[in-house]
């Protein structure tokens, strides 16, 4: 009986010492040491982690009110950078990536609540930069455990810049083209699910500029239009445009 009482007293003393050593501040009033913060009005932990003179250091774990882990952040470089992962309330991984100076950086992966890929994105200074891939919602009946690519695109400082492709769920190409600083540029082509060309459109600074051609499922040209700065030219307007274009070329060749 005496040994049981000693054990209880020892455990209670250890608990008091532990309780007294958390949620402390330094002489400047900044959080320092281990901290455990609870959801307001509850006994459920909201987050726990360690501070060093007001700066998060090492692993922090955040929780939903149901007690499931919401996020994990592992801080380094004096709290400026971190590796982060977020979770659904069913425990499945939601996203994972890196922060540099508290902004998204490098490759981030996003998943749905069943663990299937949603997107894979590249970041720099908090903005999309580089290759980004979106995936179709996972369908276990048809996807055979493999994610199906919806779009592949490239960004520069948050703006679409470079190649772009969009795919049918069967993996065949649906659309392809190029962007320049957020605007469509040059030839954009769409395809039928069979792989045959459907449309061919030319762009300049994000608007139609040049021929727009439509094809049927057999690859035969059905309509052909011509645009300048987003406006369609027809009849006499179109004839005059090509006449002026021809004269400009002749003048340029004579000037050389």
Which residue stretches match the model-derived regions?
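Glycine/tyrosine- and acidic-biased, solvent-exposed loop/turn segments at the edges of beta-strands
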Residues: 17-256
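Bacterial Sec-dependent N-terminal signal peptides
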Residues: 1-23
